[in-house]
Amino acid sequence: MTKFSLHKEGLLTIGFTLACTAVAFFFVPALGLCGICVAALVTYFFRDPQRAIAISKDFVLSPADGLICKIENALPPQSSELVEEMQKISVYLSPLNVHVNRIPVDGIVRKLHYVPGKNLRADYDSSEDENERQESTIEMADGRNVVVVQQTGFLARRVVCDLRKDQQVSAGKRFGIIKFGSRVTVYIPKDMPLLVSEGQTVVAGETILALLSETASLVTERFLD
């Protein structure tokens, strides 16, 4: 059975919603019933389920739950200081998706860059350059880099990233959350064979986006986290 838990970032919001619901019940019971529905939705949003993480050094895992809305070749963010085009995979998260983000590859966090911005709808292409976002560059053991961009959306108002510069990270581990409807984009080297396509639904920490090389094996064990 999958363990149900809540992300720590949601505890204060859930507590505040429950407190408002209690007050509403005292003054206007009908409004309190509406508050229960809101509290249930907020609790559902901040769920943090266990995932069956692939144990392998040969994969790029999805950093987010959602729908792959675009795959293309593009230059990575300037903050990465990478000058060659990479494969860009964008995942759109609806308000109903799990919003906890997970590390796509093993490596070391080399660069972290926060960009303040707007809150346009995350499914608009223009939102990538204009919305608030967090850009994180991870260097793998072979010297290649992967860049992850957490981006807010129309409902999302805050990006949370728990990474530190020079931190050693493991694929599949939690590293942050985006609060309410958003987009996560991952940039990977062009020589990595892709295993996904546009329109595909992906699961953070479980779905394999790409192989690190042509000879990498898909056979792997998994652990719950």
UniProtKB/Swiss-Prot annotation:
It is found in: Cell membrane. Is synthesized initially as an inactive proenzyme. Formation of the active enzyme involves a self-maturation process in which the active site pyruvoyl group is generated from an internal serine residue via an autocatalytic post-translational modification. Two non-identical subunits are generated from the proenzyme in this reaction, and the pyruvate is formed at the N-terminus of the alpha chain, which is derived from the carboxyl end of the proenzyme. The modification Pyruvic acid (Ser) is found at S182. It is an enzyme of class 4 (lyase). Its main location: membrane. The active site is at S182 (schiff-base intermediate with substrate). Its cofactor is pyruvate. The keyword Glycoprotein does not apply. It is a peripheral membrane protein. Pathway: Phospholipid metabolism; phosphatidylethanolamine biosynthesis; phosphatidylethanolamine from CDP-diacylglycerol: step 2/2. It comes from the Bacteria. GO terms for biological process: phosphatidylethanolamine biosynthetic process. InterPro entries: PS_Dcarbxylase, PSD-A. Catalyzes the formation of phosphatidylethanolamine (PtdEtn) from phosphatidylserine (PtdSer). Belongs to the phosphatidylserine decarboxylase family. PSD-A subfamily. This is Phosphatidylserine decarboxylase proenzyme. It comes from Neorickettsia sennetsu (strain ATCC VR-367 / Miyayama) (Ehrlichia sennetsu). The lineage of its organism: Bacteria, Pseudomonadati, Pseudomonadota, Alphaproteobacteria, Rickettsiales.
